[in-house]
Every structure is written in structure tokens, then in C-alpha cells.
Swiss-Prot record:
Residues 537-547 have a biased composition (Acidic residues). It is found in: Nucleus. One of its GO terms (cellular component) is nucleus. Residues 1-19, 133-142, 257-279 have a biased composition (Basic and acidic residues). Keywords: Methyltransferase, mRNA capping, mRNA processing, Nucleus, RNA-binding, S-adenosyl-L-methionine, Transferase. It comes from Aspergillus fumigatus (strain ATCC MYA-4609 / CBS 101355 / FGSC A1100 / Af293). This is mRNA cap guanine-N(7) methyltransferase. Its EC number is 2.1.1.56.
Amino acid sequence: MYDPARDSWEERDGDEARSCRGRLASDQPHAVFSPPEQIHGASGENNNTTDLQQHPDPSSKTTASAEVLYAESQPAQPTTQTPPSVSTRIQSPVDPAAQKASNPQSLTSTAQNQLNKSNTTMENTSGSATPKPRADPSDKPNRPVQVASPTDQNGSQGDKKRKLPAEENASEKSQPAPDRPVSKRKRMEERHQKLRKRGRTPPSAYSRRDAEETSSAADRNGPTYRSTSPLPPPRSPTPEDQPRQRKRPGGGARMGLVDRETLRRRQEERERAQVEEAMRASQSRGVADVVRQHYNAVPQRGREWRKTESKIKGLRSFNNWVKSTLIQKFSPDEEFLARFNGTKEWAEDGGVPPVEEKRLLVVDLGCGKGGDLGKWQLAPQPVDLYVGLDPAEVSIVQARERYNGMKSGRGNRGRRNPIFHAEFRPKDCFGEWLGDVDIVQQVGIDPNVGPGGSVMSSRWGGGGFDVVASMFTIHYAFESEEKARQMLRNVAGCLKKGGRFLGVCPNSDVISARVSEINAKKKARQAQAKKEKSDEAPEDGEVEEDDGKVEWGNQIYRVRFPITPPEDGVFRPPFGWKYSYFMEEAVEEVPEYVVPWEAFRALTEDYNLELQYRKPFLDIWRDEKDDPELGPLSERMGVRDRVTGKLLMTEEEKEAASFYHAFCFYKV
């Protein structure tokens, strides 16, 4: 029952205003479909008839229109994928007393009941062939439910309760049509809630990602979108590489003959390249490894054994005396020699100014076991630093032990000067740059020497050493031009301007003379043999024997060329002429190389080295044996007899000694 004071409906027991929806659902679950046109028409006719009977005035039209509006405002049933079902709309009998009532409230109540009865829910049944009616939003717009009253025709109450179109759509979308009218208070609360500004939803865990995707998509579609940097172009495949094929079971069995041949050829090429690389590596190393292994294997013998039991003790003593002579004559600088010899002229009214004695800085390329340490200790000008370099590690260890023995006083033979400071390093002096040695860097080395260097460096630059010595070693550098130039670059880089380069090596003039003599004798023998056999026909298959080897020597030394040297003895090109040298108790068939002297001297000019001295060993003895310093030194070293003055060497040792010569270059 509708209560005007509360503007709401109240239910009572037995009241027919109870919802017809519940009664239809409980009493008649299965209904027969009735078209909506008939339903609206029937309800419209009954309502119009009742209104005409009770109110023949125009106000009756308002009630009928309200009923039609309420029926149209009901939402359409949603469609599904199942076939449309048949539903029946059943009207409950209308109470005549309610229609004849003159009270407007009862009239309104009766109209509301009729509208509720007409909007009974339609239940789905299977097997229906009639389509379910759908509401057309274009033809029937959604409108709020308004119950007509007698005063609506003047526009007083209906206008006040009517909602805005936006509110009507929002209200119908938010909740379904109620079974009964909503109270005014509830409608006001719903209106305020809808008009209230909706708060921002709290961000979720994926809000930032979704926002970035949305913004990035919008930016890409915009006109000002700027693309990222382009990726680098893909690398083109190697022409030799074939596209990778898929691996399938049994694919190897389907390999063709062409693929097998290609694989075999590639394998052979790889093996050939490995062999060539190994050969190049061995050739680049040359005889350095062989020489190092040989000198590492030579046992260390004492001084007493060399003087008493050695078979070549005379040759050993003579070689040491020649090296001492070279050190005594050319290790001091010009100022020291002028002061020592008294050849420098001073002012008449003044004496010799007191000058602090300058000490030498010496680097020895191929120091060996340190056999020359005592010779440098007896040098006329004292030595401040001695640096010994040698590729044989064992020899470096033995040289360091010998130096430590000299420092401790063992083997002191009345030396005049205090022992100098010495440093020993294992280093290939001819195949590598000496600038990598720490002590050489500290003293100083010039990397700009030689061809291609700066003019200012060659004029004013230079290293920090006074003397560079190389005793019986430079013939290992003539394996190739690169090694020879590297050796001279190390020498010139270490020397300061005015420095001396001392050394001894095999005499190429002796080698050339020997080769020419041997070739001449061989030609004479061949001519004699050809003359003797000219009358006799050679037997079938007989070949004249000619090994082509050139060698000479005696019981204590031997020189052998593995290949035929030039007949005239002139070695062209000047590098790579290898021979094997044997020396009793010293050298066991070690490969060495010819040092063509004129080619070597021309090469030194490229490194600002000027030749000052060069003599064979026997000529040095002839010129220096009567020197007041070197003559007595030869007697003390056992080279000459103290009584007779005879050279204490055999003829074989003299022949072996004649194979070498000494030299000295100045750095200009």
C-alpha cells in the first residue's frame, strides 16, 4: 500500500500490491509466450476503459501514458547464444473496486499494480522458435519511471521529481529496475553519490607498465615521434663459410663426395699451414736456441784445470790476453788517456786542475759465465757499473756466482780498484730490443738511432753507456739482415756520443782465403781426374763423386760448410752463410755465420759507428808483445815464457787463433 506521508510502499498480509514477480515464479513456472504488442495493447485497453469510466475528462490520458512509459522503460532481456525461448505474460485480474475508486491515491496505487503485473519476468524455456523481443535504443530511449498523478497535468509534482537525462542513463546502467518504487530519500542519496566526484583508483602493480605501454604507443602514433637509433647493419658472412645446415639423424650418411673432398683439402691446408708456421718460427729463432742450449750444457771448470789439464791452455791464455789488450787500449775515454799519458797541454801559470775521476759504465753483450769480469776490474779507468747480458740462463747464474766470489775476496789477485757494481740479466741481445731491460733503461738507451731516426737525436742524443763489448758473439747476429741491424741498433742505442764498441769475431778474410784455396785445389783435382779418365770410357751408371763440402782445420778446431760456398770466397749476399765450428773443450759443432767485414763496416755507418781499430790476433801479438804494460801482462797470464820470451802456443793453436780478429768502433 502506498503511504503518501512517507512516499513509500508498505506490504501487508493479503495485499495485492505484493510483487507479482514472486507469485508468478512460485505459482506458474512454465508460461506461454505472448507477443509484447498484445500485452501492451491489452493493458492499454483495460487502463483506458477504466479511466474513461471513472474520469472522462482529459486527465485520464495522463494515467494511460504513464503506464506506457513505465512499460517502455523496463530494460530488455539480454540475448545469449542459445535459441530464443518462449515466455508468456499473464495478467492477474484487476480489482474493480480499485478502478472505481475516486481517490487519486488509490488510482495511483491501481496503476502501479497494473504496471508491475505487466512487467512480470519472462522465464526461458527450451525448444521455442519465436525470437525474443529486443528493445531498440534508438526508437525507445531510456527514461525514468514516473507514476502519473492528477496534478501532473499542470506540471507541478512530475516536473520536480523528473531527473536529468545524464542521471537517467547512469541510474539505469548502475542498477536494474526495482520490484517496487525507491523511496525519495534513497533516490536523493543515489543522486548525491553519482554527482560526487569519483576518486582516483589506487595504482596497481601493473599500472606503471600499462601507462608506459599506452604512452609509448601514443608517442609512436603521434606526428612528433622520434625513432630510436638504428641498429648496426648485420655482418656479412665470410665468403668461404657456407650457410649452416640443419642436423638430421643420419645426415652424415648422405654426405656427398664433393663435401668429403672439400673437408680433406681444408684439413691438408691447415696441416700445411701449421708446418710452415713452425718452420718460420724455428727460422726466426735461428741458432739462438741451439747456442743457448750448448752453452748451458758446458760444465764449469776451475782456473787450475784450465792452466794444467786443458788441451788448449795456451790458446785460452792467448785469447784472454787479446781481450785484455783491447780493454786496456780502448776502454778509457780520451780525457782519461790524455791525463794518463801526459799529452794534454795546460796553461803555463797553472797546474793540472783537480778533477774527480770519472768511472765507466759498461754493458757486455754475451757475457757468458763472466770470464771477463777480472779483465774489467783491471781496466785503466775504473768501472762503476757492469751489465752482463746473455741468452743462456745457466751462464748468467754462473757469472753471478763468480762476481759474488770476487766481492767476498776469493780469487783476489792484488786488484788495485774496489770491485764495481754488476747486474746480470738473461737476454737475447741480437734478436730483441734492449730497451726492455730495467737496468739498461735506468742508464739510458736511445730508440731513435739508425735509419729513420731523427736528425736531432743522432746529433745530440744517445745512450748512457761508455763502452759496449761483444766478445766472440757478433757472428751469431749475421743469420739475417734483420738480426744484424737489431744488434747494431742495440749497440748504438746504448752508447753515448764518443762511446766505444769493442769486440772480437771470426775473420772473414781468413774464411774467404780458405774457401778460395779449397775450391782451387778441388778444380785441380777434377781436371787431373778428367784427364786420367779421358782414355777410358765410364761404365754404365757410374757417377763421379763430388760431395761439394768445404772444410778445414786440425786436431783442436774445425770449420765445415754444409753447402758449397762461393768459389771466389766473396759472400753475396752477406747474410745467412752458415758453417759449423768445433773447438776442443769449448765448442761442439755449433752453427755460426760468416761476418763479411766490408759489409759489416758499411752497415755500421748507418748507426753512426766509425771504425777505429781492426787487427787479427797474431798481428796484435806482434805489435803489443813489447808494450810496457801488455808485455808483462802476457807473462803473468801465461802467454809468454818469462825466461825465453817465447809464445807458449803450439802451431795448431796458432792456426786456430788466426781464425779471429779484434775491432773497435767509436760512436760519432
